[in-house]
């Protein structure tokens, strides 16, 4: 293990659940507005997960008022209060970019049994 891995290991979270692309997540994000701190919920489908270690990120996509919204989060960020897996999706790809073009019921993902 080199020196960078030792430094990074101090910042790794141990409360991250196992999730994959296709899963639906509830991501509780800590939002700081001035002196106030509140929790904002972002619920959507994981369309990608990339990187490793402290640099690992995942992108969640949801449709809000007919407009697709994608947000990328660092997995080990201190601004994430918690990540909850709502349902497991059954997909055959690691990157679900094709969901960007699909609308309505076509954009649904089968639930894993």
From Swiss-Prot:
GO terms for cellular component: cytosolic large ribosomal subunit. SUPFAM superfamilies: Translation proteins SH3-like domain (SSF50104). Pfam families: Ribosomal_L19 (PF01245). InterPro entries: Ribosomal_bL19 (IPR001857), Ribosomal_bL19_CS (IPR018257), Ribosomal_bL19_sf (IPR038657), Translation_prot_SH3-like_sf (IPR008991). It comes from the Bacteria. Keywords: Ribonucleoprotein, Ribosomal protein. GO terms for molecular function: structural constituent of ribosome. GO terms for biological process: translation. This protein is located at the 30S-50S ribosomal subunit interface and may play a role in the structure and function of the aminoacyl-tRNA binding site. HAMAP family: Ribosomal_bL19 (MF_00402). Belongs to the bacterial ribosomal protein bL19 family. This is Large ribosomal subunit protein bL19. It comes from Corynebacterium efficiens (strain DSM 44549 / YS-314 / AJ 12310 / JCM 11189 / NBRC 100395).
């Amino acid at each position: 293990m080199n020196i960078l891995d030792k430094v990074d290991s101090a910042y790794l979270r141990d409360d991250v659940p196992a999730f994959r692309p296709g899963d639906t997540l509830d991501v509780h994000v800590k939002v700081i507005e001035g002196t106030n701190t509140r929790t904002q919920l972002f619920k959507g489908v994981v369309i990608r997960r990339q990187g490793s270690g402290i640099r690992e990120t995942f992108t969640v996509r949801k449709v809000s008022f007919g407009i697709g919204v994608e947000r990328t989060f660092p997995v080990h960020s201190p601004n994430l209060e918690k990540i909850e897996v709502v349902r497991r999706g059954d997909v055959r790809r690691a990157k679900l970019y094709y969901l960007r073009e699909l609308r309505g019921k076509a954009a649904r993902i089968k639930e894993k049994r």
